[in-house]
Amino acid sequence: VIVAPEWHGQVPAGLKNFFLLFSRFELGHKPALIVTVSSADGGAYPVAELRMSSYKNNRLCYIPEHVIVRNVEKVLNGNSEENDSSADAYFRERISWALGILAGYASALKPMRDSLQVHHDKFGNGM
């Protein structure tokens, strides 16, 4: 699960650096769920940015589903009195559903990761 706070409409630099430092050997052909958080109605730009470039050489496989937690201060708090109850229930259900999808992709991609087919020294980096 990749959690990215929206930072001025972008993914924070530290998270971008993570994707540059790790290679196909650590992340390759593993499924990932993108979760972005925003203090307002944003959060979509980091999803697009992650999908566009963060997987190139490390070969991380983003699943089609993602979660954008908007108005994050009003949901998922330990103290339920601080939550917007309907939004909180929605996000909890949505996150649970998305994690189930991620688990399915993890099972489906495991044989691919275990095969030698995905590790080719001549084609070590993305195009």
Predicted segments, located by residue:
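Helix-loop-strand module that forms the ligand-binding subsite of alpha/beta enzymes
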Residues: 2-58
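Glycine-rich phosphate/pyrophosphate-binding loop and the adjoining helix
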Residues: 63-127
